[in-house]
From Swiss-Prot:
It comes from the Eukaryota. The keyword Membrane applies. Its main location: membrane. GO terms for molecular function: cis-stilbene-oxide hydrolase activity. This is Juvenile hormone epoxide hydrolase 1. Developing oocytes, fat body and midgut epithelium of adults. It catalyses: cis-stilbene oxide + H2O = (1R,2R)-hydrobenzoin; 1-(4-methoxyphenyl)-N-methyl-N-[(3-methyloxetan-3-yl)methyl]methanamine + H2O = 2-{[(4-methoxybenzyl)(methyl)amino]methyl}-2-methylpropane-1,3-diol. Its EC number is 3.3.2.9. It is an enzyme of class 3 (hydrolase). It comes from Ctenocephalides felis (Cat flea). InterPro entries: AB_hydrolase_fold, Epox_hydrolase-like, Epoxide_hydro_N, Epoxide_hydrolase.
Length: 464
């Protein structure tokens, strides 16, 4: 081999090494302002008190809804097509008919008001949240836990799991005080009047909300956008977050993606025998995701355009939202006539979630979170490459949209204390499998507490 060839090979190896270092090195935590004003106009003095809130929708809104439901125009579905093209029209007719003739909003409204609701102004926006304080004996420790929903969900998703997390259970000497906020622009939380409110900025609002309520330290939990927001909270505010639990663990770094590609050559060794099919073959999963991500491209680019149609048509809104509750719960349900919606849910609870979007006119503003989180400026924050040292736990439900191995998660989460492959369930874990999720949260927080106890003991010995 000639000297010139050896030099070229050496240069190539050195170049690859430098490139690998550049794409894998830890990045510093970005400086995110804590007081950005997201309300209309210039910053001003506002009422920062915590105000009790009760859902009480004007009768005119409900009457207008009924008028629209009585005048829905349908397109005949294709022969032999179930949910492959989206929400099947024959199934939609049944949902709309129930909504029009049997769904009683006032009864459902009373159910939603079962727990205390509040609003408070954070950075110019009135933020809504549900706050549940458990009534337990003095020997039971009460731990603050903020649970953050995603799209197209809402705080309604958590109603089944509330009693499971606030009631003492065998083997644990603690329960949770729950704070369930609505993301800005979702439901009863005011939407930003200015561009730029991405998931990272929402994390700042949630941190400020918890401080307003009176918590300096707390645990966080979330799925979908909630998982992105709590990850940002843990990354930016490790002094506040004691531990994070996610039912949609995700990381998107160059090195984690390289690992996934290398893993495709020995999938069972990389992902595990029982999980390899959730990642590989990569081409098959890529096209499946491509099939399901059309909504994301629309919402990340033109949310206001699609929002006009969804805001004006309650039937269209229901179809758009409930199709996700079918396909994201189990992708195989696309081949079922009714999307198997009623296999895990009932129509009233599904419509409760749709109604939160309808009565608050928040479908457009909710979708803007996609547009704001996929801007060049937001992506340039590169939070996935800022290491997160807060104790973390991951509940991997088998029908989640994507599977990520612990090897990949380790790129981001340096203190991953628990990672469980769940026996059943999909994207909407709290709504579909509240019992499984609740138990996983309890076991995770128990490990978090043990982690801090051992850390304190080690520090105590070191100080002697």
């Amino acid at each position: 081999m000639g000297k010139c060839c050896r030099m070229l090979i050496f240069a190539a190896i050195a170049g690859i090494a430098v490139l690998y270092y550049q794409i894998t090195k830890e990045l510093p935590k970005p400086n995110i302002p804590l007081d950005t004003w997201w309300g209309p106009g210039k910053p001003q003095n506002v009422d920062i008190s915590i105000r009790p809130f009760k859902i009480n929708i004007n009768n005119k809104v409900i009457e207008n809804l009924k008028l629209k439901l009585n005048d829905v125009q349908y397109t005949l579905p294709l022969e032999g097509i179930n949910f492959e093209y989206g929400f099947n029209t024959d199934s939609l007719k049944k949902i709309v008919d129930f909504w029009r003739t049997q769904y009683n909003w006032r009864e459902r409204e009373a159910l939603l008001n079962k727990y205390p609701h509040f609003k408070t102004n954070i950075q110019g926006l009135d933020i809504h949240y549900v706050h549940i304080k458990p009534q337990v004996s003095k020997n039971i420790e009460v731990l603050p836990l903020v649970m953050i929903h995603g799209w197209p969900g809402s705080f309604v998703e958590f109603y089944k799991i509330i009693p499971m997390l606030t009631t003492p259970r065998a083997g644990y000497n603690f329960v949770f005080e729950l704070i369930l906020p609505s993301i800005p622009g979702y439901g009863f939380s005011q939407a930003a009047a200015k561009p730029g409110l991405g998931s990272t900025q929402v994390a700042v609002i949630m941190r400020n909300l918890m401080e307003r309520i009176g918590f300096k330290k707390y645990y966080v939990q979330g799925g979908d956008w909630g998982s992105m927001i709590i990850s940002a909270m843990s990354t930016l505010f490790p002094e506040n977050v004691l531990g994070q639990h996610s039912n949609m663990c995700f990381v998107n770094t160059p090195s984690s993606n390289i690992k996934a590609i290398i893993g495709s050559f020995f999938p069972e060794s990389f992902a595990g025998t029982g999980n390899a099919h959730k990642m590989y073959p990569m081409s098959e999963h890529f096209f499946t995701l491509l099939e399901e991500m059309g909504y994301l491209h629309l919402q990340a680019t033109k949310p206001d355009t699609v929002g006009v149609a969804l805001r004006d048509s309650p039937a269209g809104l229901a179809a758009y939202i409930l199709e996700k509750f079918s396909t994201w719960t189990n992708r195989s349900w696309r081949s079922v006539k009714d999307g198997n919606l009623l296999l895990k849910y009932n129509i009233p609870e599904l419509l409760d979630n749709v109604m939160i979007y309808y009565v608050t006119d928040s479908i457009t503003t909710s979708m803007r979170l996609y547009a704001e989180s996929f801007t060049k400026a937001h992506l340039a924050l590169n939070l996935d490459r800022v290491r997160n040292h807060v104790p973390a736990a991951c509940a991997k439900f088998p029908n989640e949209l994507a599977y990520v191995t612990d090897c990949q998660l380790a790129e981001k989460y340096k203190t991953l204390l628990q990672s469980n492959d769940m026996p059943s369930g999909g994207h909407f874990a709290a709504f579909e499998e509240p019992g499984l999720l609740a138990e996983d949260i309890f076991t995770a927080v128990k490990k978090f507490k043990e982690f801090y106890s051992k850390k304190a003991e080690s520090q105590k010995k070191a100080d002697l």
